[in-house]
């Protein structure tokens, strides 16, 4: 079975657990560091319209709307999108990364910015999505990506791009169907961005006590 299909099947099976996890603020890394980090990075640019890709149950979209942005969310998992709509109204729709890469029309044709927050897991679909996103953005549009910091992998295993074994260890709920995910080195991220984007800034949010990096945020602008 293709990795992309396994990833989608896992998220569909775990949608209810994920919704409950986010609703109850059960991920310390997010509540302590990374949620604020991505919101602050976007707020510093303050785009008028923004597309939240891989929005899940919609927490980030809702937060950005409270800050005056016209935020919209898309996700491949229908159950997550339905939950987001129930909480916040019809600012969400179902769309997979392959559909976006194929040019699927959304509720708004162009956005000032897009954000992908801890939602780049596959190899090929990630590359195709990032390559295709300028078609959804205005000229000199912004792309914000928050993902696992490369040092998190470097500290545990060899520092090479490739598929890594995933798990739901550490989650408070009974998640199932762990999947492999694709890790990229910093060099490979830069190569992926180089054709369509300028790298404007890189942020490295750290844990307030351990001072270890919790994520990396790439702030990009289309060429």
Predicted regions and their residues:
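A short glycine-rich, Lys/Arg-flanked "PGG" loop and its adjoining helix->strand segment in the class I
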Residues: 127-142
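Short alpha-helix
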Residues: 179-196
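Conserved S-adenosyl-L-methionine
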Residues: 198-208
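A short SAM/SAH-binding and catalytic strip from SAM-dependent methyltransferases
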Residues: 112-126
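A short acidic, Gly/Pro-enriched loop at the edge of an enzyme's catalytic core
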Residues: 103-114
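Class I SAM-dependent methyltransferase SAM/SAH-binding core
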Residues: 51-53, 57-102
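Conserved class I S-adenosyl-L-methionine
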Residues: 1-45, 83, 144-171
